[in-house]
């Protein structure tokens, strides 16, 4: 393996929420999504809330990259599923015959970029470059249409010196939801780390919800990325967590460098030996103990963990004035819940984190995504970072331009029936193209 020693940074990639953002209730095993199905959404607020988080992250000295919304509605999907005629006729037919398909075609779920891909940094593989495999998201119709466009976006962002791969084939047996079910544990010195893949299939199965990640998918990615077998770990997600609404691992666990925080019901008992192997291997490779904080059900009920998305907080290493500080970005729901508020205060008092910020992501949260859902974390060396396209990097001027577009052109209310209005949909596609053009300017390298 590449036991390199160089400075790495965790670039954060977020996607702007699209103008057809709505509450379709499509998320498999996603309690928040299902509970808000049919409610009126606010696409303008959703996009601005996402930009507010990006601004905060960039202000902490963390590299923040921006992707445009994927084009929606997806008329190719409607046509492939048997709807014909003009675009206006296709929309009306879909609404009357199968509104779930219409909702899927207009879904903005690609905003949750933690599901965009699984990332291996160059120091973990002999490939000599970062390797990214786009997630197939084959567990859901509305998400399965994302991978083709995601591949184009990521390939455009990571130009030279990166290995960007298409989604795994294989359908249901190879269900893959990307980085939301992957944790990388490491030191802070740029040396190779250990990779944990979390899956939900296999006995005992959940009783209520279909697991969206398979063990076979994680194994395939580990092989494909050239990861050393001794440095790869597969944890089975606890069926109770999946049934409670933890449709991804990042709803009940979070990690950063040498820290793993998880709910006691995050992992199934059959994973305990694998966790012990991880601890031994980490100390052997990284030359320091792995810090594992297990949050008990007595301290935090599983239902409260999922309602607040405490474990979906975003951990970053802030870099300001030459100093680095571990900072955690929590949903405001964590602050509003006395138990989780006390928990994060305790973690700060114990110097696990040096600072906490509470972020309002109400529109994303109602769809089932917190701060960590909205970002794809990509560890990059300084040289690799320099190869990224300048047009994707957050800047004050780019932020200002995007806010102006969103405030002027995004709707402030949207319901599913509106998605059958051809004027609304044409305007949405025009807005998405304007944003894409904004993020294609100043092309080059950073």
Positions of predicted regions on the chain:
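The feature marks the mature, well-folded catalytic cores of soluble enzymes
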Residues: 2-446
